[in-house]
């Protein structure tokens, strides 16, 4: 009896949700038709007036009233009166005293491909050929089995890397493969970078560096593995049918 009531409520819930979605309609956007709000072309209702040669009171070729080629009245090609292409007056083509000018330089458009490329590059800042650069770590305290190497490490630990290069953990079958690859690329990259600065490494340096980087790579693997499994658990949790049904019911209560 209880199961039948629960099934009925679930059925009513989904019917109500689909009915509510079906009744929703798009509202028409406010505003007029095409080209409302004034013309965008010069000389048609724009605040700067007509952009073509003015036709004043005088006739064509007359000495007054703005005739074509005349010294007064703002004629076409004259130094006064705001004629076409003139340095004075209002409403001249290409002048600073009007709005909506033809030759106003357009603002540079942002290239979306460049933006997307920059975003992608920022995701692996410091990366190297498909490898990611881990966060800085404190150099581990390691005992090498003899006093000389222990003392050498304490005195020279600043010369060794405090970050490691690695690939995502899902590209490896086990921890050993991850650590092996991580140690090789990190030691190689640090050695090349340091050598170009004029500093060389001895055999003792390489031996100690490999041990130090190995411990750091193990730590990096543990961090990445934990984060990877947590992401996977979250996806499984929110994709289960009971959780989806519960979320749908809560959304229905909020919207309804």
From Swiss-Prot:
Gene3D superfamilies per UniProt: Prion/Doppel protein, beta-ribbon domain (1.10.790.10)
Positions bound to Cu(2+) 3: 80-82
Signal peptide: 1-24
Domain notes: The normal, monomeric form has a mainly alpha-helical structure. The disease-associated, protease-resistant form forms amyloid fibrils containing a cross-beta spine, formed by a steric zipper of superposed beta-strands. Disease mutations may favor intermolecular contacts via short beta strands, and may thereby trigger oligomerization. Contains an N-terminal region composed of octamer repeats. At low copper concentrations, the sidechains of His residues from three or four repeats contribute to the binding of a single copper ion. Alternatively, a copper ion can be bound by interaction with the sidechain and backbone amide nitrogen of a single His residue. The observed copper binding stoichiometry suggests that two repeat regions cooperate to stabilize the binding of a single copper ion. At higher copper concentrations, each octamer can bind one copper ion by interactions with the His sidechain and Gly backbone atoms.
Disulphides: 182-217
The protein's name in its UniProt record: Major prion protein
Residues annotated as binding Cu(2+) 4: 88, 90-91
GO biological process: protein homooligomerization
Residues cleaved off as propeptide: 234-256
Species this protein is from: Moschus chrysogaster
Glycan attachment positions: 184, 200
Family of the protein in this entry: Belongs to the prion family.
């Amino acid at each position: 009896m209880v199961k039948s009531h629960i099934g009925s409520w679930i059925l009513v819930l989904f019917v109500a949700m689909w009915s509510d979605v079906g009744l929703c309609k798009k509202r028409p956007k406010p505003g007029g038709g095409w080209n409302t709000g004034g013309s965008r072309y010069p000389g048609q209702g724009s605040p700067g007036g007509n952009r073509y040669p003015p036709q004043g009171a005088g006739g064509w070729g007359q000495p007054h009233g703005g005739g074509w080629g005349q010294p007064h009245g703002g004629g076409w090609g004259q130094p006064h009166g705001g004629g076409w292409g003139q340095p004075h007056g209002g409403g001249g083509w290409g002048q600073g005293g009007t709005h909506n000018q033809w030759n106003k330089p357009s603002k540079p458009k942002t290239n979306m491909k460049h933006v997307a490329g920059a975003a992608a590059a920022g995701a692996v800042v410091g990366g190297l050929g498909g490898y990611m650069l881990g966060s800085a770590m404190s150099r581990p305290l390691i005992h090498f089995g003899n006093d000389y190497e222990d003392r050498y490490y304490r005195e020279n630990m600043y010369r060794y890397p405090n970050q490691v290069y690695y690939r995502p953990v899902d590209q490896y079958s086990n921890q050993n493969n991850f650590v092996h690859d991580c140690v090789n690329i990190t030691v190689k990259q640090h050695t090349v970078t340091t050598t170009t600065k004029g500093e060389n490494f001895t055999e003792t340096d390489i031996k100690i560096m490999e041990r130090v980087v190995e411990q750091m790579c193990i730590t990096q693997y543990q961090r990445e593995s934990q984060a990877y499994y947590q992401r996977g658990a979250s996806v499984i949790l929110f994709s289960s049918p009971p959780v989806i049904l519960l979320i749908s019911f809560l959304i229905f209560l909020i919207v309804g």
